[in-house]
Regions:
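Extracytoplasmic cell-surface/polysaccharide-interacting catalytic and binding patches
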Residues: 2-86, 90-235
Length: 235
């Protein structure tokens, strides 16, 4: 487990219709919010039970509890929910980012345009909300899946009910007026009782000098990653 210094405390509150009190993380650190830790050895994390997910992954324990409650509620309404992606630390995100970076080199070169193309759906290492163990991808990663049929019903249920369990839709449709940040991701939901704490800490403590150690990191400031991608949502 990464040893962290207690640097931030947030007051308690409760999530609407959720029986558990809002978890408070009093040991948030720069290393944590930028993903430089191992979830499998972190005291707040656990492996997600197989009945909740499609593959082996880790999430924060509080997120697992809340998702199980949401999954059960959805099932009672005929809706099936399954986590298909959970925590990705810095090095996992780096692997995804650099694979795409190298694949785009022939077309875009080592340029900001290369980074911007990747940023449509993938975060720079050090800036992904998936670092925090609070954010999950549900059921399918295709925008078209949630536009019709079963996927649309699942999305409608989530938009109506997920907040009762602490989960919020992170990357809202462009029609909502959002012009910065990633493309809409109907599958991406965040456990806001914790993620709001990490987002607040991130905006107060992370600088562009913290973006290092991966291909294309030099473009983070020019592309306003902190302002236009990490900070694009309130939760």
């Amino acid at each position: 487990m990464v040893k962290t210094k207690a640097v931030m405390a947030v007051g308690t509150s409760t999530v609407s219709n959720l029986s558990l009190p809002t978890p408070i993380d009093t040991a948030i650190s720069k290393a944590f919010v930028t993903g430089r830790f191992l979830p499998q050895t972190h005291i707040r994390f656990q492996m997600v039970p197989a009945d909740l997910c499609s593959k082996s992954m880790y999430l924060q324990k509080d997120v697992v509890v809340a998702f199980r409650q949401m999954k059960l509620a959805a099932a009672s309404d005929g809706i099936s929910l399954r986590i298909i992606s959970g925590t990705r630390n810095f090095w996992e995100q780096q692997a995804i980012w650099e694979r795409k970076w190298k694949a785009n080199l022939a077309q875009f070169g080592a340029t900001a345009k290369n980074a911007r193309e990747i940023l449509k759906y993938s975060s720079m290492p050090s800036s992904s909300r998936h670092h925090w163990g609070t954010d999950i991808d549900i059921n399918n990663l295709s925008p078209g899946y949630f536009a019709t049929g079963r996927g649309l019903k699942e999305l409608q249920w989530l938009r109506k009910n997920a907040i009762k369990f602490g989960f919020v839709e992170v990357y809202s449709p462009r029609e909502s007026g959002r012009i910065t940040g990633y493309e809409p991701e109907a599958w991406h939901w965040s456990y806001s009782p914790l993620s709001t704490q990490y987002l607040s800490f991130y905006k107060q403590n992370i600088a562009y000098s913290d973006f290092k150690g991966f291909l294309g990191c030099e473009w983070a400031k020019d592309l306003r990653i902190i302002e236009d991608y990490v900070s694009v949502n309130l939760n």
